[in-house]
Amino acid sequence: GDGMSTPQIYAAMLASDSPTSFERFPVSGLVKTNSKSHKITDSAAGGTAIATGHKTNNGMIGMNSDSIAVPSMLEIFSEKGMKTGLVVTSYITHATPASFVAKNINRNNYEEIALDISQCDNVNLLIGGGRKHFTDRKDGRNLIDEMTYNGWKYHDTLINSTENNEKVLILAAEEHLPTSAERGDFLPGATSFAL
């Protein structure tokens, strides 16, 4: 997680009657995600550290502490000809996933972040929630329609397949997706689709 540490992981392992997902990982690593401005990070600064390798101030996404945009690993991979994507169960505009595809000084600028995402040309697949930030906007724009016009294929639920070169946007909820107990096999299905 973007701000989680080993004590939280170990506590979950102790509380669980069965092995946690973390115990099934073949390898593990640690990254220091404290923010530039605070000893305790938030999802924006933590997500930016993971996505870009740059520390930033709490609340900022996709840019360094001097408010200068920095490339995320998705941008770097895309420039090398690789396909990229994000699969999340939160808003796609939420701080952690947004750190991979948007640049903003305030993690709560959801409509601006959605606009950044809609204009992002270095990602091929976006799956998550947060549809309202693309459609129910103060500026009256429908970013899903704009993305569709620009070649994206939009769906509001998981699909079985797509053409290899299509850009796909799946926003399966107005806000966050339901809890893991309520959403069933959405995440494994979305992950399989992405791969």
Question: Where are the predicted features?
Answer:
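N-terminal catalytic scaffold of extracellular/periplasmic and nuclease hydrolases
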Residues: 1-137, 141-161, 166-167, 185
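Anion-binding catalytic surfaces of enzymes that hydrolyze or transfer phosphate/sulfate esters
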Residues: 158-195
